Amino acid sequence: MYAYSGINLTHNAWSPIVLELKTIAENLSSSKLNSVLINRYRNGLDSVSWHADDEKELGDDPVIVSFSFGVPRKFQIKPKDKSDKRRYLFSLDHGSVMIMHGNFQAHWLHQVPKEPKIETERINLTFRYITSVS
């Protein structure tokens, strides 16, 4: 069982399209991936707050490959070190792929902030490798 945002998730079979995206993600990242989280952002009020994908089940220096489909959304990153005031903003456009790897999760937080003016949806698939199940 893998827990995400306080929710225990169970295993489901890979659909053909998700399996195809997994293969693309593995080729782009040169990594083996065995799990995907699929999130639906119904509109700009759906968001994910500042966090790092640093759960122990992901191991050291996890590789996260993220596909975005639908309306573009903002993606922000900032250092975990509160004394470091750097901030970066990216656009997750339809069809884009973002890869976080190396020690990114150890040193950075990221979020998809609320954007109240957005009225259409976005689907996000994040592939990763789960090293152990608690």
Cite the ranges covered by each PLM segment.
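Non-heme Fe(II) oxygenase metal-center motifs and adjacent flexible, charged/small-residue loops
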Residues: M1-S134
